[in-house]
From Swiss-Prot:
Contains an active site 4-methylidene-imidazol-5-one (MIO), which is formed autocatalytically by cyclization and dehydration of residues Cys-Ser-Gly. The lineage of its organism: Eukaryota, Metazoa, Ecdysozoa, Nematoda, Chromadorea. GO terms for molecular function: histidine ammonia-lyase activity. Keywords: Histidine metabolism, Lyase. GO terms for cellular component: cytoplasm. It is an enzyme of class 4 (lyase). This is Histidine ammonia-lyase. The keyword Lyase applies. It comes from Caenorhabditis elegans.
Amino acid sequence: MRLQVQIGTECVVVPCKPDDTIHAVAKKSVEKLRRLRPKLPLADDYFEVRRTVGNSLLDPEDLVSDVLKDSDFIIVAASVEETEDAKEAKKQEEIDNARAEIEKIDNRRRKVSFADSLAPMVLAPPTKLLILDGNSLLPEDLVRCEKGECAIQLSMESEDRIRKARTFLEKIASEHRAVYGVTTGFGTFSNVTIPPEKLKKLQLNLIRSHATGYGEPLAPNRARMLLALRINILAKGHSGISVENIKKMIAAFNAFCVSYVPQQGTVGCSGDLCPLAHLALGLLGEGKMWSPTTGWQPADVVLKKNNLEPLELGPKEGLALINGTQMVTALGAYTLERAHNIARQADVIAALSLDVLKGTTRAYDPDIHRIRPHRGQNLSALRLRALLHSEANPSQIAESHRNCTKVQDAYTLRCVPQVHGVVHDTIEFVREIITTEMNSATDNPLVFADREEIISGGNFHGEYPAKALDFLAIAVAELAQMSERRLERLVNKELSGLPTFLTPDGGLNSGFMTVQLCAASLVSENKVLCHPSSVDSIPTSCNQEDHVSMGGFAARKALTVVEHVEAVLAMELLAACQGIEFLKPLISTAPLHKIYQLVRSVAPPLNEDRYMKPEIDAVLEMIRENRIWEAVLPHLETLEAMEELDPDALRQFTKTPTGIVQDRSMIPISDDEESIE
């Protein structure tokens, strides 16, 4: 017969006879692993043997045939031959390796972070071509623009539409018909007729007068999203822009030349007038711009050094550049994608915390969620079933408390699908609104060349994205509320059974004490930021614009909420991994063990107090790079497919189906295998 033997994080298959003793099997297992892994500091001896199922202790004098069956899984806790110097050297090596990995993460982040970029820098060339047609742009496309991955180009159909609209508009202007913003003033001045010789001056004055924003500028990579989205709206062919000017805008985008755009100053109605005016101002050669070759410089200098021509405005073209909801929508699309990523990873992090806290998976039984068929709830429950203990995906930690008397867990563990689920559903609701807005003509007036009409309307009103982003902030904030409470359970000895603040020498060391305090402060800030911006309205423009959306702040604070949520979940993830140190040699399921290993690449176990912020930041950057999700995705896809074929596959205490997914370090070594790469 054969037994599968776990020693630390390694696994070996050991042949044995029915009349062998447990002691003989344990000795043989240690000898085999020492031969296959000569660098492991294993002693010749071991100190206990346990069955994986139930974590029950085995008597070394028992015969194998009396207590085990063929192919059973056992755990041998072996002694480690390490001097104190070797232990210290190992700790230092882990810290040094983590610092090197943190430096790599910082370097990746700097490549797309230009907030403080005053000097020239080298950027990687774009790897994708994005065709803009005004109808098919997606939020993830804008994020690719933000990362510098895309160059853009107009579709041929869009160019035709733009030409037709411009030809018709120039005809209207030449006939000097009374058309708002073409031959009249703006807002309260809409009753003022402008003489033909001043129509171009009217548009230039509009840009200059409306560029009155306040506050810190958008980072160049985010201003680039704003530019790409405005080009996409102009590509619909209802704005009246000329093909020549839109091609100049595309050339500026592809050269990574972007204007100085203050973040504050829009009320989200009549479009995002202030920020879009700043965007246009730089393209006219006024104000400031940024490019990789110049850093921040006067706009005319930046354009000249990049061989770009400034825009030359004809009738209505100034209004076409600034009348729209693109500031709210571009930031909203970016925030939406980050919310989508953190919501998925929140399911993974919650699963790891539940295993460390020795919670039960029974609350995720498919029948519970089938009779409350919210899509997000069922999706979250499925992920938790796939990540956590089942016969198909075993966790030694879960097996160790199979026979405990606990009936149910606290809400932040038991109700993860119900709370995370509504976040998933809210994100998809917001995605529909934002995607529609990204491909909508939001000018005023709008040019309908086929009808030969120019019609004034209200598509510039930002209520749709404003309300959606307020809703998004409210929903996503719940992820941090749940996470911070799980973090509290992890650091609280009375709730977790783990050492207080997850430190082995409390008193001398404070461990994760203030990590939880920081998380609590961010959750508290989010509660204030979740007050909806869009419930407010202050009339503007002499009461002509008497209801506004306040969407600009809705977008900015939604992004801040998401950033706080990412940070809180990074802290929970670090704490959950620290909790595992006190459960060793037991390990979690294969996908969750992979997350543990990923975190340990930048954050070694906290054996004594040290400066933790670089490690928190590194784990946070991993979350922002979506690496937690990407690490478990192959496992999720396989295990979820198993449940689709067999609804009982991921239930607790079920028969093991085929297709077990295991981390490479957990795959048993065959008798004739001499090494593991």
